[in-house]
């Protein structure tokens, strides 16, 4: 394949370490007949070995430069459906038959928007395996009352079972990023982790609490609750967001929903 240099504005870091590719392939464990969609195949380091095992693969790529070389390389391996579009503008069911598995070495500058785009379509998804900045994987998988725990932890864990699989050093990529990477597995759940009346109210409470994470809840949630209301919901008004688990956020969100509904 003709040498193609990574484009910084696209957040490209091409995977090149064969050992890491083998580990990632083992984690994904692609099988024939499975419908798999890859986000950002790039130069095909993961694309081609996955295609070799599942025989047919869907891949969404925004970088026009890689399409023809990748298509030519894949022709001898299996059927590769290349879609030249922005992943954030795609409804997965439009380009690949559901249920689908999603894989990808995600651009670090777009990882959170892509994650939320995926969980919004979770009913069509079997599982997801993503290479991300290690800090993001730590945040996704963080338990309550740990430094990495935050809005991303709560929101992704609401929708998915999460598991950090292994770390990836910078030298596994070309060019090497300035940070460590990691691979995470996300499995959408058929039911939400916590009982929630309104996703919008849950998102609102979680966002407000973590937007001022060093403030006590009586301050960060003052627009919605009096301290006595927090105590009635078994939430300490002097606590900070990082010490509040998902179930407690669900209670707060449900109370806010009922409060506004009865106005």
Swiss-Prot record:
Subcellular location(s) per record: Cytoplasm
Reactions catalysed according to its record: adenosine(1518)/adenosine(1519) in 16S rRNA + 4 S-adenosyl-L-methionine = N(6)-dimethyladenosine(1518)/N(6)-dimethyladenosine(1519) in 16S rRNA + 4 S-adenosyl-L-homocysteine + 4 H(+)
Annotated binding of S-adenosyl-L-methionine, by residue: 13, 15, 40, 61, 86, 105
Enzyme Commission identifier(s): 2.1.1.182
GO MF terms held by the record: 16S rRNA (adenine(1518)-N(6)/adenine(1519)-N(6))-dimethyltransferase activity; RNA binding
This protein's UniProt keywords: Cytoplasm, Methyltransferase, RNA-binding, rRNA processing, S-adenosyl-L-methionine, Transferase
Record carries keyword Methyltransferase: yes
One Gene Ontology CC term in the entry: cytosol
Principal location listed in the UniProt entry: cytoplasm
The keyword S-adenosyl-L-methionine belongs to this UniProt entry's keyword annotation: yes
Family of the protein in this entry: Belongs to the class I-like SAM-binding methyltransferase superfamily. rRNA adenine N(6)-methyltransferase family. RsmA subfamily.
PANTHER family given in the database record: DIMETHYLADENOSINE TRANSFERASE, DIMETHYLADENOSINE TRANSFERASE-RELATED
HAMAP family given in the database record: 16SrRNA_methyltr_A
Function text: Specifically dimethylates two adjacent adenosines (A1518 and A1519) in the loop of a conserved hairpin near the 3'-end of 16S rRNA in the 30S particle. May play a critical role in biogenesis of 30S subunits.
Record-given protein name: Ribosomal RNA small subunit methyltransferase A
Name of the gene this protein is made from: rsmA
């Amino acid at each position: 394949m003709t040498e193609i240099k990574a484009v910084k504005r696209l957040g490209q870091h091409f995977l090149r370490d064969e050992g890491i590719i083998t580990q990632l392939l083992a984690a994904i464990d692609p099988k024939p007949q499975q419908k798999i969609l890859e986000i950002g195949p790039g130069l095909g380091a993961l694309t081609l070995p996955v295609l070799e095992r599942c025989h047919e693969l869907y891949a969404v790529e925004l970088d026009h430069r890689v399409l023809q070389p990748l298509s030519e390389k894949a022709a001898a391996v299996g059927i590769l459906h290349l879609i030249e579009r922005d992943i954030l503008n795609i409804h997965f069911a439009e380009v690949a038959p559901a249920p689908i598995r999603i894989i990808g070495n995600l651009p670090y500058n777009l990882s959170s928007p892509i994650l939320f785009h995926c969980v919004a379509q979770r009913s069509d998804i079997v599982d997801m395996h993503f290479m991300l900045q290690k800090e993001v994987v730590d945040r996704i998988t963080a338990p309550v009352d740990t430094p990495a725990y935050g809005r991303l932890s709560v929101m992704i864990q609401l929708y998915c079972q999460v598991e950090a699989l292994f770390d990836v050093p910078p030298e596994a990529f070309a060019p090497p990023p300035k940070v460590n990477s990691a691979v995470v597995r996300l499995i959408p759940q058929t039911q939400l982790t916590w009982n929630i009346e309104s996703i919008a109210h849950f998102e609102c409470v979680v966002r407000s609490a973590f937007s001022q994470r060093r403030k006590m809840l009586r301050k960060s949630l003052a627009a919605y609750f009096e301290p006595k209301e927090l105590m009635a919901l078994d939430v300490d008004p002097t606590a900070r967001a990082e010490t509040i688990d998902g179930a407690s956020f669900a209670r707060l969100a449900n109370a806010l929903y009922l409060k506004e509904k009865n106005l």
